[in-house]
Amino acid sequence: MSNVFQNTSTVTVLQGDYKVTTDPKVVFSTVLGSCIAACIYDEQVGVGGMNHFLLASSAGSGGVSARYGVHAMELLINGIMKKGALRSNLKAKVFGGAKMSANLSDIGANNADFVQRFLRDEGIPVISSSVGGTSARRVRFHACSGAAQQTHVADDRRLGEEERAAVARTQAAPARKPAAADNVTLF
């Protein structure tokens, strides 16, 4: 399965973003600390995607943004379905949720618990997951086949500092309201 990563173009999925493709030449990539990447796919149709969310919920801030788990999951699943996936074929792989700082609450564990519960409630089986621990991960995902690769990041101290700053910015800034053209169906 590792040969699906050869001769491909890499598309980076940043915090608060999601990507969907039917192109077998595209591989999604992201680096995670306490954040979560849900990789959801329908290998029979050849479509899939990855999200990268920062926090499980907006904690009462009223935020509707892909920075938050529920919205990120809804956007990803709807995006995959719009590309022709059958809900009954969807499978997931989940990564991230590390405890990046002893000085912060365990945001990673909260994120991991959220995504596992969300997928279970939605009836989407989690085929594999790598969550928790104390180190960052780089994840590559071939969305059309569901193949995934993970490597642990050796020097993740800077990532932990960046995540603390991102959490602070997210909690301080109001979330962007979706444009009318976003047209997302929540289920």
Curated annotation (Swiss-Prot):
Cite the GO molecular-function annotations of the record. Answer: protein-glutamine glutaminase activity
What's its EC? 3.5.1.44
Sorted alphabetically, the keyword list is: Chemotaxis, Hydrolase, Plasmid
Q: Which Gene3D superfamilies match?
A: 3.30.1330.200
| Keyword Hydrolase assigned | yes
One Pfam annotation reads CheD
Q: Which reaction does it catalyse?
A: L-glutaminyl-[protein] + H2O = L-glutamyl-[protein] + NH4(+)
The record's listing under InterPro entries reads: CheD-like_sf, Chemorcpt_Glu_NH3ase_CheD, Cytotoxic_necrot_fac-like_cat
Q: Which GO terms describe its biological process?
A: chemotaxis
Q: Which SUPFAM superfamilies match?
A: CNF1/YfiH-like putative cysteine hydrolases (SSF64438)
Q: Which family does it belong to?
A: Belongs to the CheD family.
**Which HAMAP family does the record cross-reference, listed alphabetically?**
CheD
Q: What does this protein do?
A: Probably deamidates glutamine residues to glutamate on methyl-accepting chemotaxis receptors (MCPs), playing an important role in chemotaxis.
Q: What is this protein called?
A: Probable chemoreceptor glutamine deamidase CheD 1
